[in-house]
Amino acid sequence: MNMPQSLGNQPLPPEPPSLRTPAEGPGATSPPEHCWPVRPTLRNELDTFSVHFYIFFGPSVALPPERPAVFALRLLPVLDSGGVLSLELQLNVSSLRQENVTVFGCLTHEVPLSLGDAAVTCSKESLAGFLLTVSAASRVARLRIPFPQTGTWFLTLRSLCGVGPRFVRCRNATAEVRLRTFLSPCVDDCGPYGQCKLLRTHNYLYAACECKAGWRGWGCTDSADALTYGFQLLSTLLLCLSNLMFLPPVVLAIRSRYVLEAAVYTFTMFFSTFYHACDQPGIVVFCIMDYDVLQFCDFLGSLMSVWVTVIAMARLQPVVKQVLYLLGAMLLSMALQLDRHGLWNLLGPSLFALGILATAWTVRSVRRRHCYPPTWRRWLFCLCPGSLIAGSAILLYAFVETRDNYFYIHSIWHMLIAGSVGFLLPPRAKTDRRVPSGARARGCGYQLCINEQEELGLVGPGGATVSSICAS
């Protein structure tokens, strides 16, 4: 990933000690006044792809009218080729003394170029460089080169007087410029619409911007296909407010005495809302805590909601149900730490919970010798609609959702999953608190245990019997 080929690709001398202007005529030698030394720079490494170059007695540079100033910047192999080389020239207008002075800079690789007194160019034969210009009208010039070639870069600065396209050598005006050169991972840290990431391809390490919200370019500054502020706000509101569909399942769970399940649904609704508020690209972002924490809690709440709903449908013994709830929370936390975006993090717990549900319903059906749940109304008005809604949500999530339609397909996913919980959550088990006439409760040490009616109160009050005597 080298720089553009406009700089030439012919083998050149590695580092000449000085810059010479070609003499007139064949065999002639350059006069001594046309030989200028190359001024080295100091290198200060701060971090990966973060290097500052300092010049002696800088950062201001005085440019006398009779000769240019040449600086050498050394980029090391591997360490510097994956960043962005930035150069900034700033003209000190107060040093011009009302002269019409223009400062030209020419940045070339491996071989310096001399700037003439008349026509100013930054190319010669097969060698080309980057030209910078500062004057009283335009005081600052900036240049950025992503993924620069390693080796020695030469910056030649020359001050000339007059108005273009032809200039003349200044007589008594000494221009002063401020030079700032550094190597950074990304262009302007990718701005508000991007994130600078350190990447590796085979053995090549480099940094690049990951742009969001439709922005493009080296520094995420190209807004040709960018999303508008209104569109960003709409997508954020849809993803956040769609989680309010969990409110009906929470109310239904509390009314049915499923307090633990209601707590899990509330946890999921809260962290899913604020995770999507923090996860949005662009500037419509609101984070109440660290992004990684919000993402973990959102994923854990989503998986736990599926887990507790299916386990509640199995109608297991309270002790077994509590053990499965706790075991599921611990195993899901471990799985999310291992691979948060893995497919089996969603399918594995769901299939295991469905296996428990199928086993519990099969055992209960065999013991009762009829289908469980026993009422056709529950199958027709609860289980079938809930299963269809949940299946549709899974199909949308797995096969329809893309990066382009994420904001509204994922919002529909929120609403469908929350709606399916309201259908699938089983009704409250009815309990008959009436004690048979032949039984008398003991006031000290024992209590009567009455059978709980499991399905919609199908057994009448007269059918309640004392099942056992439990030690308190």
UniProtKB/Swiss-Prot annotation:
GO terms for cellular component: endoplasmic reticulum; mitochondrion; nucleus; plasma membrane. Glycans are attached at N92, N100. It is a multi-pass membrane protein. Belongs to the TMEM8 family. This is Transmembrane protein 8B. Disulfide bonds join C186-C196, C190-C209, C211-C220. May interact with EZR. One of its GO terms (biological process) is cell adhesion. Its main location: membrane. May function as a regulator of the EGFR pathway. Probable tumor suppressor which may function in cell growth, proliferation and adhesion. Residues 182-221 form the EGF-like domain. The keyword Transmembrane helix applies. The lineage of its organism: Eukaryota, Metazoa, Chordata, Craniata, Vertebrata. It comes from Bos taurus. N-glycosylated. Keywords: Cell adhesion, Cell membrane, Cytoplasm, Disulfide bond, EGF-like domain, Endoplasmic reticulum, Glycoprotein, Growth regulation, Membrane, Mitochondrion, Nucleus, Transmembrane, Transmembrane helix.
